[in-house]
């Protein structure tokens, strides 16, 4: 997995260059972006991540529950392994999520994603 805490924490967590290089040592290694990544790893410098996906403060999203439901990362993040530069592949809005829940037969209960003042 690319993200260190995706299965265990509220947030997926952002990897650092050495973790990225575990795969990228042999994948797209001639790409200028991956070369910069390798340099960060070699120099043990933190990566200047730019967050691509955000949900509103009133929405709770659990990567862990989606992983346990066997939802593929690519369902929202696309074919990351084929990208030189990452971009937001899917919207982080209610319509996108509800459409996916309907396709997968997942619950549509409001309290899965929203705190209802209980």
What are these regions (language model features)?
Residues 1-118:
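Short sequence/structural segments immediately N-terminal
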């Amino acid at each position: 997995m690319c993200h260190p805490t995706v299965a265990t924490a509220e947030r997926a967590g952002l990897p650092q260059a050495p973790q990225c290089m575990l795969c990228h040592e042999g994948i797209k290694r001639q790409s200028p972006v991956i070369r910069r990544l390798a340099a960060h790893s070699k120099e043990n410098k933190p990566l200047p991540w730019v967050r691509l996906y955000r949900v509103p403060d009133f929405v709770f999203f659990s990567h862990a529950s989606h992983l346990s439901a066997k939802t593929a990362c690519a369902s929202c993040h696309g074919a990351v392994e084929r990208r030189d530069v990452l971009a937001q592949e899917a919207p982080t809005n209610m319509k996108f999520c509800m459409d996916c829940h309907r396709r997968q037969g997942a619950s549509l209960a409001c309290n899965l994603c929203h705190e209802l003042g209980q």
